[in-house]
Amino acid sequence: MKVAVEGCCHGELDKIYESISYLENKDGVKVDLLLCCGDFQAVRNEGDMKCMAVPAKYRHMQTFYKYYSGEKKAPVLTIFIGGNHEASNHLQELPYGGWVAPNIYYLGYAGVIRYKGVRIGGLSGIFKSHDFKKGHFEFPPYNPETLRSVYHIRNIDVFKLKQIKMPIDIFMTHDWPRGIYHYGNTNALLRQKKFLRQEVESSTLGSPAAADLLEHLQPSYWFSAHLHVKFAALMQHEAKNNTAPKITKFLSLDKCLPHRDFLQIVEVADRPGSSEQLEYDPEWLAILKATDNLQKPTCNFWNPPQDNGLHSRWDFSASEEAMMEVVSDLSGDLCIPENFSLTVPPYDPSQPQPHALPAYSTNPQTTELCATLNLTDIYILAGQSGQIYGERGGKGATEEEDEEDSTGSADEPSDFPSDTSGLSSSYNPDEITIEDEWEEEEDGGVGCGEGKGMDAVVPEGQVGSQDSDRDSSPQRETAKRLILPAPCAKPKTEAPLHSLPRLSLPPPSACVSQGSSEEEGAFTAARVPKRTSGETTQSSAGQTGGTPQIKRRNQSIYTAVEDEESDS
């Protein structure tokens, strides 16, 4: 089958689909599938833009809202992962993946699905060592720290992916696997991106977590983006168990701009007789069920179970029996239901609302999947955790939880001791760099981290001390039995969707990233400091004038001709 691969989307769906149509007519082919490697920007309305980690000058509605509202429908089945410029409040509704619009599917924090028998997996976000060992604790309204940390990948998701034993055909990450540049034309890469030389020569460019997954999964194809350059590589893996060594074809593509290599069609062998619809992957769903109790919505460090004598179980790979149980849970039907529904009002160009506050809601797709497989909605779990932590004075966790979550972590080195992701001295002038390049201004509009607009659909579940057994914790039980409003019957409706129940939000996350807001330090194994109630009060008082606007240092770098072209 013909698979179109896109680098960074940046919300330019109209242009991408037009480019695919042009290639189809030019080459006489029919594209079966589009894969987008992050920075998708599924922005539904003006409120979503305030939950996207880009400076205000780069916040543009683009064209996704047309596909969300039903004005248009994607002409090609589209699958995407998240990057570091996303409408995070939208994607957090779908931690296990789901439809963001008809015919457009998000893979979630991590996921594996099937199309025409081809196994397609992905990992959303980018790697930052200081957040890697934390749980998915972020919950809107975001503060300036969580607005960035929310898209950092976590070891729980990497751990789940490392339980996969069956072959993967295609895998996607936003940032590159560390070291992959040594398997392609490195000199040509450095001629195009001279600022990468230091990190390439020191083998510190890219994600060590992705490199770990590349070694474990050894997929046939690996697609990435992030660096805004086309680069291909061919990696031969070491032979295992007396079998022939596997080969991974790596391809990274540019962002969607004129005269840039942002799209390429790849021919992938499908499996005759396989379903023409997207399908769940039984092995992956069995892994999700097995690891459900490992979810910890905390900003304290957590290490996955290991065969070190401290854990009763460390292998969460899927047995044949577990996979058959998943198939039974789905009543034998692996086809992913086309159950998209609106959860917030779409953008209306005739009635712009530039001061609209972000809206937050649970998603019926996630609720349905969790009910079917008895999974925990990570988004709700984080929200419940935020409520509990907020009522404890914003300290982030009790002493018991802190002790439990940091066991085996506080005194251990990083999983990737060579990681220098916080020490990168190079910058990509072609990238809208957010990490630690923000400076505050005195005046500013309302942002997602301000803590206003507390009208999200969030469960009010029982609040109390957590038991040591996480299976019986109030927040987990509430997360599993939350009853959602009925989804919209049509993709486009006259009603403004204000009929959705509105419940109180927890306060903004009290956890503070270990990296400085000015310059990220190297990864340390120190325990995450807690914020005292006094600090929380002071922070809240400082926000009464509205969340400060953000600007970058070195603005002159971003006035390149290509950016002017993109603005036009």
Curated annotation (Swiss-Prot):
PTM annotation (Phosphothreonine): residues: 478
Binding annotation for a divalent metal cation 2: 39, 84, 174, 226
Biased composition (Basic and acidic residues): 467-480
Assigned keywords, A-Z: Hydrolase, Iron, Manganese, Metal-binding, mRNA processing, Nucleus, Phosphoprotein, Zinc
CDD domains named in the record: MPP_Dbr1_N (cd00844)
Highest taxon of the lineage: Eukaryota
Record EC number: 3.1.4.-
Activity control mechanisms: Active in presence of diverse metals including Fe(2+), Zn(2+), Mn(2+). Also activated by Ca(2+). Binds two metal cations in two adjacent alpha and beta metal-binding pockets.
Coiled coil: none
Designated name of the protein: Lariat debranching enzyme
Organism: Danio rerio (Zebrafish)
